[in-house]
Regions:
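Active-site activation/catalytic loop segments of kinase-like enzymes and analogous catalytic loops
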Residues: 43-79, 95-106
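Secondary-structure boundary elements
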Residues: 21-23, 79-82
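Active-site acidic catalytic loop and adjacent metal/ATP-binding pocket
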Residues: 1-42, 52
Length: 147
């Protein structure tokens, strides 16, 4: 895994794996992808899924139109250093690729959950990856500390 480290990370903090009470996240579930990693990898996974870092056309809730602002909030809330921010966008792309390789592998192996998810998410995943590559400069600028 890229960005290997010494922290134990969930690696799939999508909203289906979070338990909410009264509108607040109180627990993570489903640790089948947990592994060692770094803070940057953890922020990349969370921001990718929670900001969410994808085209506005693929965001159908109150987060629509606020992707770059929410990405900045993630970097700021985690207190990322300038060197960590410098590699965060690369980590987002690597995290996206890594997770979808896991999903594709599960689908190829006949795992029903992965197969169902991949058939529904493939097009969005491809659109999102293309957007990351087109918007890399914009994504980096959104998390660069301002003087």
């Amino acid at each position: 895994m890229p960005f290997a480290g010494r922290l134990v990370l969930h690696n799939d903090p999508n909203l289906d794996n979070v338990v909410f009470r009264h509108g607040r996240a109180v627990a993570l579930i489903d640790f089948d992808l947990a592994s060692p990693g770094t803070r940057v990898w953890d922020v990349a996974a969370a921001a990718r899924l929670w900001a969410p870092l994808r085209l506005d056309d693929d965001v159908q809730d109150a987060r629509h139109g606020r992707v770059l602002h929410r990405f900045r909030l993630f970097a700021d809330a985690y207190g990322l250093t300038e060197p960590e921010r410098a590699v965060l966008v690369d980590a987002v792309i690597a995290n996206h690729d890594w997770l979808y390789e896991v999903v594709q592998g599960g689908a190829r192996a006949g795992h029903a959950g992965f197969s169902d998810y991949w058939s529904a998410a493939r097009d969005r995943a491809e659109r999102t990856r293309s957007w990351y590559l087109r918007a890399t400069t914009q994504l980096r600028a959104s998390i660069t500390p301002q003087p």
